[in-house]
A protein has these predicted regions:
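Basic, short loop/linker segments at the boundary and entry of helix-turn-helix/winged-helix-like folds
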Residues: 9-17
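Local cysteine-cluster metal-coordination motifs and their immediate loop/turn environment
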Residues: 32-38
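Short, small-residue-biased leader/transition segments that mark boundaries at the very start
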Residues: 3-8
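Short metal-coordination and nucleic-acid-contact micro-motifs, chiefly zinc-binding Cys/His arrays
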Residues: 26-31, 83-86
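C-terminal, charged low-complexity interaction regions
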Residues: 140-221
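Long, low-complexity, intrinsically disordered segments enriched in glycines and aromatic residues
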Residues: 97-160, 164
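Histidine-centered nuclease catalytic patch
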Residues: 38-101
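Short, intrinsically disordered, charge-biased short linear motifs at domain edges
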Residues: 16-24, 73-80
């Protein structure tokens, strides 16, 4: 709605409370973590376990053109409250006590020059997910993006890779059934399956949309 769009354009101080900020970010992101794309609990729930992330970190002395572009802010002070610099993340597996990911792993590391803010990236995804469930950067990202994915955000921790691989396997099984029925897939059938995957990826609350979009692109580039 236009009212919601107006809210999204406001900066952090415009919101009356922390719950309102979380809820607006949750809605903007379709209910999934900005980095790993796990489904997030509704922030209205008492035990939501979400974290408000600053893409350009709050506590850093680094500031340059990449930081301004990534955060949408004019300076470090502005970045701490700028709407485009705010993301909502999962708890980074904090409760597990190890193999942290996302904001929990990133901390105050500045990745503005090495990666891209999900809110500032025009294509539908930052990650390409292979059949093995591992995530790599899509074309167009900086050359250091793999380091960010693997070592800073740690998006290839084994638990994330396993669940993405399981998702891929479930769809591959369905594709194989269609192949057996038709003795192979025509280009139209491949395009139809790709369209269904892309539609599913766009549904609010759909986990791991980049995995579905990667599969769709392999079916029908």
């Amino acid at each position: 709605s236009s009212a919601a769009s107006d809210v999204y354009k406001r900066q952090y101080p415009a919101f009356s409370s922390d719950p309102a900020i979380r809820k607006a970010l949750w809605e903007r992101q379709g209910g999934v973590c900005a980095y790993c794309e796990r489904r997030l609990r509704n922030p209205d729930e008492l035990d939501h376990r979400t974290r408000i992330e600053h893409f350009h970190p709050q506590h850093t002395t680094i500031w340059g053109g990449d930081c301004s572009r990534s955060s949408g802010a004019t300076d470090q002070g502005d970045s701490t409250t700028h709407w485009h610099n705010l993301l909502l993340c999962c708890d980074g597996f904090e409760s597990a006590g190890r193999e942290f990911t996302c904001d929990k792993a990133k901390g105050n590391t500045d990745i503005c020059a090495q990666f891209r803010n999900p809110t500032q990236w025009a294509p539908p995804r930052l990650l390409d997910v292979g059949r093995d469930g591992r995530a790599t950067p899509v074309d167009g990202l900086p050359s250091d993006a793999p380091t960010v994915i693997n070592d800073v955000l740690r998006l290839n921790e084994r638990h994330l890779v396993a669940v993405r691989k399981q998702l891929i396997s479930s769809f591959v099984q369905r594709i194989n059934v269609a192949k057996r029925r038709s003795r192979g897939l025509t280009s139209n059938q491949r395009a139809d399956l790709a369209t269904k995957l892309r539609s599913k990826a766009a549904e609010p609350g759909q986990e791991y949309p980049s995995t579905l979009l990667s599969m769709a692109d392999r079916l029908a580039p």
